[in-house]
Structures are given as C-alpha cells and as structure tokens.
Amino acid sequence: VNCGQVNKALSSCVPFLTGFDTTPSLTCCAGVMELKRLAPTVKDKRIACECVKTAAARYPNIREDAASSLPYKCGVVINVPISKTTNCHEIN
C-alpha cells in the first residue's frame, strides 16, 4: 500500500470530514472499503495509518469526531484509525 492509493481512496471524504456534509457520500464509503482492502496486514495498516495522518495534516479543519465516526457511518469495520493523532505503531 502507498500514500497515493490511500489519498485516492479517501479524497471524496473531505466534505464529510470537514463538516461540509453531514453524512459520507457513497463514493467516500467505497473509498473506506477500498482502504480496508488495501491494508490486509499489520504492516499495511501501519503504513496506511501514517498516510492518513499525513493527509489529515494538510486539512487543519478536519473534525476529529467526523474522522473517528467515518468507518461506522459507512458500515465498514476497519483496523486503520482515521485520525490526526493515532499512534500508528500501536496497530496490531
């Protein structure tokens, strides 16, 4: 997995993550599902996590509550936290 793939998967989620939209779009949720598919191993999950943190840092107005609720709102169980503050090395 690389950051280009992660960024592409989650790019359509920015309106939801910044509070512009109240629910994630179908395209956004498809991206969350793609992120899950891209990161099957612990190593992949840690890399994806770092990519998410780097991408989130470019958007200072990302709402942490929206980010943490994104997988749940999309109905996707994913072991890659979507957060600016996650310690990615703690992912198992």
From Swiss-Prot:
Quote the Gene3D superfamilies the UniProt record gives. Plant lipid-transfer and hydrophobic proteins
Disulfide-bond pairs as recorded: 3-51, 13-28, 29-74, 49-88
Provide the coiled-coil residue spans. none
- The source organism is Ricinus communis
Give a single Pfam family match.
Tryp_alpha_amyl
To which protein family does this belong? Belongs to the plant LTP family.
Indicate whether tRNA-binding appears among the record's keywords. no
Could you tell me what this protein is called?
Non-specific lipid-transfer protein B
Q: Which domain of life is it from?
A: Eukaryota
What InterPro entries does its record include?
A: Bifun_inhib/LTP/seed_sf, Bifunc_inhib/LTP/seed_store, Plant_nsLTP
Q: Which GO terms describe its biological process?
A: lipid transport
Flavoprotein listed as a keyword: no
Q: What does this protein do?
A: Plant non-specific lipid-transfer proteins transfer phospholipids as well as galactolipids across membranes. May play a role in wax or cutin deposition in the cell walls of expanding epidermal cells and certain secretory tissues.
> Any idea which UniProt keywords this protein has?
Disulfide bond, Lipid-binding, Transport
- Report a single Gene Ontology molecular function: lipid binding
Entry-linked CDD domains: nsLTP1
